[in-house]
Amino acid sequence: MHFSLKNLIAFLLLIAAATNAQTVSVLHEKKTNPSDLEVSGALTGLPTDSVRYITREELLAMPQVTYTPSGDTNFSGPTRIRGVRLEDLERALSVSPSSEMVVAVCDDEYRANYPQSYLAAHHPVLVLEINGKPPSGWPKDAQEHKFDMGPYMVSNPKFVPGFKIHSYVEEPQIPWGVVRIEFRDEKTVFDAIAPRGLFAQDREVQNGFSIAKQNCFRCHNSGREGGQKSGLTWDVLSQLARFSPKDFAAYIHSPINRYAKAQMPGFPEYDEATLAALTSYFQTFSKQAKP
């Protein structure tokens, strides 16, 4: 049988459409099991910000990777991980996998952000099994040894920091207690915390922005974007940075000493240059002159 180039392209597009339809068909409108993973955002074949669910069994039927992680602080000793790469999950479910970022949302409203640059560099994995066991057999959290790390978590096969800004070194994004995966437009998400005003492009402001995207944004929110675990919004942080830079720096170094309800760890390793960059960045959200 002879196919013209035009017919061949049409045939391939038909196959692609069928594949996408097949992918969307596995998503469910309602959650029927505690282990069902919520997915939302730009889902193929659905209106923007739709919410659907995918079962653990369906995730296990997707292409899997198996590895022993290196440098993952959630684990002590040799650990065998099995799961689905976030890139593969995005390709299967997202409308625009080449431009969408992945956001992992935890049961305590902590969020880990995976822009395209992170996905390409570190290939994070949605963990389905640890040492051959489902979440009920997983170890407790590494910090307090009392919290379940399921129903899902994210790990990196081998994390090698890709950049360093002053004393800040790129951090692995390895949340546990993950209950939702979002596929979001990267520009929209990060525009919510892009520096404001005349000095937005200042080098140190941009340095602070790069750090805040990876660190602060996990627990602090600006409107609907960002984590809400801390209870302190971007506006609160910006006001603190503007009116009391010393207290702002002290909060970063040791949160619990400045805010009794603080849950985030301190960052005593941040040097003056790192703190100055963060301070300059957050000050751009307040009405004032040069930060």
What are these regions (language model features)?
Residues 12-21:
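Hydrophobic h-region of N-terminal signal peptides that target proteins for export
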Residues 229-237, 253-285, 289-291:
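Axial heme c-ligation environment in periplasmic c-type cytochrome domains
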Residues 187-211:
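Electrostatic cytochrome c docking/interface patches
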Residues 75-83, 95, 201, 205, ...:
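Solvent-exposed, acidic/flexible segments
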Residues 23-186, 291:
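Structured, non-membrane catalytic/scaffold regions adjacent to prosthetic-group chemistry
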Residues 85, 204, 212-218, 223-224, ...:
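Short pre-active-site segment immediately N-terminal to redox-active cysteine/selenocysteine motifs
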